[in-house]
């Protein structure tokens, strides 16, 4: 089972495209928005529709993609829970690459 994703900048997201045409790649950003009342290792759980931090590279757009792949049967606040390997774009371009070492989600 994949590791649970944690918000508030705890876990990394690799971006092979960035969010603007002038972005250098590959680049790494962090998880951002998350649940305010369901926690994994004292960090909010990442959920369906939560956004990643803005791309950190100079010249990139400020678009913040939403989590679009997630657990099909574990829910946080009524939304699918994010996991290691889930994607913020749905096309494999903004993938969660770290997660909890002791909480796993189907």
Regions found by a protein language model. Give the residues of each.
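Intrinsically disordered, low-complexity proline/glycine-rich segments
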Residues: 1-106
């Amino acid at each position: 089972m994949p590791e649970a994703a944690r918000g508030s900048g705890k876990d990394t997201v690799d971006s092979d495209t960035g969010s603007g045409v002038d972005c250098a790649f590959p680049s790494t950003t962090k998880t951002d928005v998350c649940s305010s009342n369901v926690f994994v290792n004292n960090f909010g759980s990442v959920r369906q529709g939560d956004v990643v931090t803005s791309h950190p590279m100079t010249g990139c757009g400020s678009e913040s993609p939403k989590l679009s792949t997630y657990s099909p049967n574990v829910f946080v606040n009524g939304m699918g829970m994010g996991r290691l390997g889930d994607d913020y774009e749905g096309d494999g371009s903004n993938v969660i690459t770290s997660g909890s070492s002791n909480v796993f989600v189907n």
